[in-house]
Amino acid sequence: MDLLTTTSTVAVACYALLSTVYKGMQAVYSLPPTVAPASEDLVGSDLWPSVDVIIPCYNEGPLTLSACLDSIANQEYAGKLRVYVVDDGSGNRDAVIPIHDNYAGDPRFDFILLPENVGKRKAQIAAIRRSSGDLVLNVDSDTTLASDVIRKLARKMQDPAIGAAMGQLTASNRSDTWLTRLIDMEYWLACNEERAAQARFGAVMCCCGPCAMYRRSSLLSLLDQYETQMFRGKPSDFGEDRHLTILMLEAGFRTEYVPDAIAVTVVPDRLGPYLRQQLRWARSTFRDTLLALRLLPGLDRYLTLDVVGQNLGPLLLALSVIAGIAQFALTATLPWPTILVIAAMTIIRCTVTACRARQARFIGFSLHTFINIFLLLPLKAYALCTLSNSDWLSRKTATLPNADKKQIIVANPIAGVGTGSSGSAEAIRRTDLPRDSSKLVNADSVCSAE
């Protein structure tokens, strides 16, 4: 039994050492830079770049979609703005048609109606190939933006070396359940520690889908690779946000984080949907980490530590916990060194975060340690063993009745015809889709916050 005790103690000690170094450097690099922020020196619509906002939606609730579109319509942006809402074969299209009609008189809005569900990636591409703006902003349909988000992201993108930039994510339903409160804190840590530290070196590893802006010229050069991503000979059907970010870095572009560009998104309020979401994210993270490894020699050494900390850390923690549980099962003695080290690290981290964020609620993030150890670590192990599985888990393909699968239906309210009006059929244009139905895939609609 001494072997189990030694294994648990050594593993947790290595985990503590690695986490202390990694989280310590992350805390330093995530501090706001001391240089003065760039001034808003662009005055007049002619100087601001044109922006195309792309919003893929699938079975989104009418109220949620309406809130999303309202936040886009009310952006305080002096440049040219176009909005492409892509209905990805929703089964509730009749319920959201009135929402489309509300924007029929706004020349900035275009609606693309896909006859069947093809996934977020192909829904995005359908709009990207139709759009023409200097910058492309991807927004999830359950997300609302602060009124200055587009302006702040566009200002960051003034540097031509930057290929992508993301805003800060918060949970719109934070107060609903204990789980949504934890997820909101998880988002804060992911944005203001992990992404902020990565952005110090211009290498945010995942620009999250709810609010991510891309340079159109950079995006177009990578579009074919993005569309045809394969894993073990199969189309990769989720994790598009992380993969597109990795492609940007591989092409030599910087990826940035803008903390004061606030996007509010809906998060899972029950454990089942949360764990299914985490399983998708874990699979996509493992897949694209393999691609990211070849980028590390050209990036700052902190990014290597970041990858090691995020992958080796959970492995050491899992080893210490498994050995500790085995020790308890076989000897009825508690692995006190492991318990005390994990408890101390949890208390220290939550206290430091609470002081830094100036929010006492982060003390309650201690509860996340139990979720991490007993739910997320086993889930990540399962994800690693099932990397080839591309099931969306919470979403099934929907085909609209009587829809022609070879067509994209584009309803353009610019012509003054709402998609729900009796004359809308006359305003519809049809374009052939690929005949190979195997190219129609499902994709994840949320980014990884980890």
From Swiss-Prot:
Protein EC: 2.4.1.-
Sorted UniProt keywords: Cell membrane, Glycosyltransferase, Membrane, Nodulation, Transferase
Does the keyword Transferase feature in the UniProt annotation?
A: yes
A GO term for molecular function: hyaluronan synthase activity
Entry superkingdom: Bacteria
As for subcellular location, the record says: Cell membrane
State a single Pfam family of this protein: Glycos_transf_2
GO process annotations (BP):
extracellular matrix assembly; hyaluronan biosynthetic process
How does the UniProt record describe the way this protein sits in the membrane? Peripheral membrane protein
EC category name = transferase
Principal subcellular localization: membrane
- Coiled-coil segments: none
Q: Does the keyword Nucleotide-binding apply?
A: no
Purpose:
Involved in the synthesis of Nod factor, a sulfated N-acyl-beta-1,4-tetrasaccharide of N-acetylglucosamine which initiates a series of events in the host plant species leading eventually to nodulation.
Protein family according to the UniProt entry? Belongs to the NodC/HAS family.
What this protein is called in its record is N-acetylglucosaminyltransferase
Which species is this UniProt entry from? Rhizobium sp. (strain N33)
Gene (name only): nodC
